Amino acid sequence: MQITMKQARVGAKMTQQQVADKLGVHVQTYQRMEQNPQDVTIKQGKEFSEIVGYNFEDVFFGIESN
């Protein structure tokens, strides 16, 4: 099941500012990440997945994990 970064963030009941703070980036940088997830590095993607509690593969590759 593929979900977007926004869906994962909202599912975690977090604001863009909260996620940006945890990733150590400016909120505008995080907003660009949500709009262009193909530009997110693997490291950022894995950190994001840990923060919001969703599997990296589900968010960035649309692969359902077991």
Question: Model-derived features: where do they sit?
Answer:
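Short basic helix-loop element that most often maps to the first helix and adjoining turn
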Residues: 3-22
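Short coil turns linking two alpha-helices in DNA-binding domains
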Residues: 15, 26-29, 55
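Acidic-residue sensor for enzyme active/binding pockets
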Residues: 16, 34, 57
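Long, hydrophobic alpha-helical segments
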Residues: 42-45
